[in-house]
Amino acid sequence: VPLARQFDWVWALLIWATPAVIGVVIWIYLGKAEKEENARKEREEPINKEVKPIFSDNTRIWKSGLAWQMATFMALQSFVFYVTLSWLPEILHSNGFSESSAGWMLSFMQIIGLPASFLIPILADRLKDQRKIVIGIIIGMLFGFSTLLFGHSAIMMVVATAIIGLAVNGNFALALTFFGLRARTAKDASSLSGMAQSLGYLFSALGPVIIGAVYDVTGSWTTPLIIVLVTIVLLLFMGLLVGRDRYVLD
């Protein structure tokens, strides 16, 4: 919103497109380099005529209870994450912030969450049991969204936004870290990641739509925020299961 008002929506959207263009250029370069490296290895290594099975043993991942818990955790945390990105400015606007200020607050939330995105995976990797991290993150989420629901002062809204930024970004990073922590091999981690992220993002994509529809029906952010708080409580239960020291396919 701030950039759109200063320039127009075209330039505001182009700013977001810039990192994507840079990413595509890097991806093309790395893809060519990898292709050349694979070709070199094929020339140097003897041909392996061993026939590999069509279906991997890791299809067992779909029968793993821990894998389904991971998928549910991923779905719930992504639901909260994308609802926050989509509707936080509107919620702040309804609490007295101008459209421009609410837009800047969303940027503030994402920037202040960067340290958590870097530090949470490091901390989680040093611990065998990550349940205390989950509890800390959930407390932050509950405080932040409860403040959005019941708070009225601008200062409290800023504090809530900061805490939400730390919590949701930290939780997103923790969810991705769990794929490596809950698998004994890279192959298992890949299978777990593919399953959990596919199902998780499929569900979470409905989050902003559902919350927006509820707001349209009720005309208030009270019920949508209650739905988010209930989702966070469910996320706590899933996090306590996933955070235990164990491995998928064991």
Q: For the regions a protein language model found, what residue spans apply to each?
A:
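Helix-loop-helix hairpin linking two adjacent transmembrane segments in secondary transporters
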Residues: 1-35
